[in-house]
Every structure is written in structure tokens, then in C-alpha cells.
A protein has these predicted regions:
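A donor-sugar binding/catalytic signature common to diverse glycosyltransferases
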Residues: 32-45, 204-251
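Catalytic donor nucleotide-activated moiety binding site of glycosyltransferases and closely related
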Residues: 2, 164-203
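Active-site-proximal region of nucleotide-activated glycan assembly enzymes
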Residues: 52-123, 265, 269
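Membrane-proximal basic amphipathic "stem/tether" segments
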Residues: 97-109, 306-385
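Catalytic binding pocket for nucleotide-activated donors in carbohydrate/polymer assembly enzymes
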Residues: 225-295
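Active-site cores of enzymes that catalyze phosphoryl transfer or operate on phosphate-rich substrates
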Residues: 107-152, 156
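Short loop/turn segments at strand-loop or loop-helix junctions that form parts
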Residues: 1, 63, 135-149, 184-185, ...
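Active-site and donor-binding regions of nucleotide-sugar-utilizing enzymes
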Residues: 2-85
Length: 385
């Protein structure tokens, strides 16, 4: 049984009433709190921190970093969760697991299912425009300024604006040896590009797979693009706290000097560890579902809001509760045996039904058969008088 309550219910004059929350949990026999992104607003965050401090069981729910992925985390959220700790995933894989993981990675790279909408692949265009012999290419994918992981998991001097300033200064220092390609996040507001004269801002429609393929190294705060860099065997330098940041997988810069030192080094990652991490996310941590989005604008930024998820895999506390291969809806011709119980409805011959059958093809009827208006219309037309 699920009971929902807005965060405001537990606040009086903007002050969190802890006793009211505890009483509510007790009165309704609630033994676990579900948080959709506990950092989503300040009130929810206060409740989340209180729940953690009081050892109240909870589940954090949000989108994952792989295509179609979502997580139900009973330990924390994103970087603050211990479920990403290395002891959970750095385990030996057998040959079949390695092969399966590589095939999954190839399906991501060759596919067209991304966290954010991407343009068509056009690697040669990008290469012809920016490739220069003996120069390293640095790809910098930007994030939304007000995103949770920017607001809560960054540090000075690498806040959002400070990051761009440092990247611009670093690009000037390395102008003889490096080319910096920067891509704005599709949901971000406009950037004063003229302020960053040492950076090349590539088209917003550039596919990230092309950009990662072309570059020698990725530099980001804590973008999920860093995970794509890993699976494509490209070193990634994080300038903020990221849930996927571990020795051997990527590199972390805490200041501009460290960033510069990394960029002039020959960075390599341990791809065997990458496979272990991806295997863990895919098979032991993430749930998967096809999501349906609508774009909205609020508080000065664009949002992609999910209004429906068709789950085909659900994992909670390392247990799989659902795992199906196909969630595509199937349409049947009205002559199918599946409609045998409804023969009277299908063959009752009044003038309205004849018109209905004549004007509307079977495949259209099949597509709309689950809608409420269709059921009402059937009732009117087919019910015996």
C-alpha cells in the first residue's frame, strides 16, 4: 500500500516538524519512505536527511546514467550512496559475462537511445572541422546550472561558472598542444560564448558519441557523459564529485593545477574495471523502463518531465522482481481468435456499426481499443436493446 503526502504537510511556517512526520509514519503503519530525487527541493532534502539520521528506511528513486535506466536506492542518492562503493562491483567476471557486457556496451554506442536527445551521427564532419595533427582534442560536455549534482556535489573552484572560467584559462595555456570542444547541455539556458574565446563551442546537435570518438580526453564536472567516456575507453577527468569516480576508471581534479597536470599526462584507464562497473549497474543495481517525456519551462530553465514509465526490469536491494524482454504492445486484427468472446459485438449488424466498420479500418480500431471513449462508443453501438 502506497500513501503519498506533499512535503509542505510536514512544515509549519517553513520549519520542519519532525514529530508530525514520525506521527504520520506511525499512524499509517509506514515502514519505508520513497523519495523521488531527495535533493529535488529544500524541504524534501530536510526530510531525507532526517530520515537518514534517524535510521528510517527509505528508497531514493531517479533516472540512472545508462539508456532507459532508473534506480531504487535504499542507501542514498547518487554520489552520497554507498551502493556505488568499489567493494560492491569490483568482482571477477567470467568469459560469458565479459562478452555480454561488451555486447551491451556496443549496443549503447551503436544505438540511438540517449539520456538527452542527440543529433544524427556525423563523425567525419566533426573530424574534418577540428582534427589537427599533433594536437590533443579535449571534449567538455556542460551540464544544467541548477541540476542537483551541480548544486550539491561540486566544490570550489569548480562550481558551474568557475568551471568554465578555468577551462577557458587552461585552453589558453595549452593552445599550442590542445583543442577544446565544448557542448552546451540541451536543456541549459544560453551561454555568453564570446566570454570564452579559447573554447570551440560545437553545435548543440552534435552527437556525444561522435565527440567522444574524436577526443583524446573528456573533462566534465560530474556529467553522466563521463560514463560514456569510460565505456568508449576514453579517460575522463572529473572536476566534481561523481558516483562513478574511482581509481582506474577516471581521474579527479580538485583545482586548476591538477587539471592542467592531468591534461599534459598520458592518461589510461583500466577497461577490465570499467566492464565490472557497467556489469554491476546493468545487472545488480539499475532498473530499466521505457520513459515518455514532455518538455516544460519553469524557474528559468527547461525540464524533461517523465509522465510514464513502462518498466521491463525492476531491481530493488539487489533482487530482481521483474525481467521481461519485450514491452511493445501488440495489435491484433479483429478477426483474431482473441476476440472470440466478443463476437456479438463484432458482428451485430445495425446501421451505425456498418458505418463504423466501413469508415474506420481494423488497424485503427486496434490502436484505439484501450481508450475510454472507444469503450463508451462500443457500449452505445453494440449493447442489445
Amino acid at each position: 500500500n502506497v500513501i503519498s503526502k506533499n512535503e509542505n504537510y510536514f512544515f509549519e511556517d517553513e520549519k520542519f516538524n519532525q514529530d508530525k512526520l514520525l506521527d504520520f509514519l506511525k499512524q499509517n503503519n509506514i515502514n519505508k519512505i520513497l523519495f523521488p530525487n531527495p535533493y529535488g527541493n529544500e524541504k524534501r532534502l530536510k526530510i531525507y536527511k532526517f530520515a537518514k539520521s534517524e535510521n528510517i528506511d527509505f528508497v531514493c528513486f531517479d533516472r540512472g546514467a545508462l539508456p532507459d535506466s532508473w534506480f531504487f536506492d535504499t542507501n542514498g542518492f547518487n554520489y552520497d550512496s554507498n551502493l556505488y562503493n568499489e567493494e560492491n562491483w569490483n568482482k571477477v567476471l567470467n568469459k560469458s559475462q565479459i562478452l555480454e557486457c561488451k555486447e551491451y556496451i556496443n549496443s549503447i554506442i551503436d544505438g540511438n537511445n540517449f539520456l538527452e536527445k542527440q543529433g544524427k551521427r556525423n563523425f567525419n564532419y566533426l573530424k574534418d572541422k577540428f582534427f589537427v595533427n599533433d594536437k590533443k582534442i579535449v571534449f567538455v560536455p556542460l551540464q544544467v546550472e541548477s541540476d542537483t549534482v551541480i548544486k550539491y556535489f561540486t566544490y570550489k573552484p569548480f562550481d558551474w561558472s568557475g568551471f568554465l572560467d578555468i577551462i577557458n584559462d587552461t585552453a589558453f595555456k595549452l593552445r599550442q598542444t590542445h583543442i577544446f570542444l565544448v557542448k552546451k547541455h540541451p536543456l541549459s539556458l544560453k551561454i555568453a560564448k564570446s566570454k570564452y574565446k579559447n573554447l570551440n563551442f560545437i553545435s548543440n546537435k552534435t552527437n556525444i558519441i561522435d565527440a567522444i570518438s574524436l577526443c583524446d580526453v573528456v573533462v566534465t564536472l560530474n556529467s553522466g557523459v563521463g560514463l560514456y567516456a569510460m565505456i568508449m575507453n576514453k579517460p575522463c577527468i572529473n572536476c566534481a564529485n561523481a558516483f562513478y569516480n574511482f581509481q582506474g576508471l577516471n581521474f579527479q581534479a580538485h583545482n586548476s593545477d591538477e587539471l592542467l597536470r592531468f591534461l599534459v599526462s598520458d592518461l589510461k584507464i583500466d577497461y577490465n574495471k570499467v566492464l565490472k562497473f557497467i556489469w554491476y549497474l546493468k545487472n545488480n543495481f539499475y532498473s530499466f523502463g521505457k520513459s515518455y517525456y514532455k518538455k516544460s519551462f519553469n524557474n528559468g530553465r527547461f525540464y524533461n518531465k517523465v509522465y510514464k514509465i513502462d518498466f521491463y526490469k525492476i531491481v530493488l536491494e539487489n533482487q530482481c522482481f521483474l525481467d521481461v524482454k519485450n514491452i511493445d504492445k501488440v495489435s491484433y486484427n479483429f478477426q483474431s481468435l482473441i476476440y472470440t468472446p466478443y463476437k456479438f459485438e463484432l458482428y451485430n449488424k445495425n446501421i451505425f456499426i456498418k458505418l463504423f466498420d466501413l469508415l474506420i479500418p481494423d488497424w485503427v480500431k486496434s490502436k484505439i481499443s484501450h481508450f475510454r471513449f472507444y469503450r463508451i462508443l462500443k457500449k452505445i453501438l453494440y449493447t442489445k436493446k
